[in-house]
Regions:
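Hydrophobic, well-ordered beta-alpha structural blocks that scaffold small-molecule cofactor pockets
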Residues: 1-53
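Hydrophobic beta-strand scaffold residues
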Residues: 38, 60, 100-101
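A generic structural signal for well-ordered alpha-helical segments
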Residues: 53, 58, 90-94
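Short acidic/histidine-rich motifs immediately flanking catalytic phosphotransfer sites
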Residues: 56-57, 72-76
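Conserved SAM/SAH-binding loop
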Residues: 63-67
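ADP-ribose/adenylate-binding Rossmann-like module
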Residues: 76-81, 87-112
Length: 123
């Protein structure tokens, strides 16, 4: 078994989300439901992310990612950009800093993965 299943309480945990497009939107929705304290780094973000960020007190850093953005204060980082090389670089930087990393759709370079979630109405 490569991955160890566990649930984590993200309330007040600092999470770094790198990316500002549709993939980042989906991850952001999950993080908000879990009450995580999210910081987003992206030179551009969708209007959806801007709206959600404003409503949920999420910090957006409108810059290109650099390794200087990584800080051990983050519980984990999610690389959700559309740039494969950048995502790999984020994974390498996170590993150097002993920060858990998820690179969307690249499980071979992730420390953890997000399982599929099936939501149903009230039973």
């Amino acid at each position: 078994m490569k991955y160890f299943p566990f649930y984590i309480d993200l309330k007040k945990k600092l999470v770094l989300l790198i990316g500002g497009g549709e993939v980042a939107e989906r991850k952001l929705d999950l993080l908000i439901k879990a009450k995580a304290n999210v910081t987003i780094i992206s030179p551009k973000t969708t209007s959806y992310i801007l709206d959600i960020a404003e409503k949920n007190n999420i910090k957006i850093i409108n810059e290109e990612y650099s390794s200087q953005h990584l800080d051990k204060k983050y519980s984990f980082v999610i690389a959700a950009t559309n740039n494969e090389e950048l995502n790999k670089s984020i994974a390498v930087d996170a590993n150097k800093n002993n920060i858990l990393v998820n690179v969307v759709d690249r499980p071979e370079i992730c420390d953890f993965i997000f399982p599929s979630i099936l939501e149903r109405g009230d039973i």
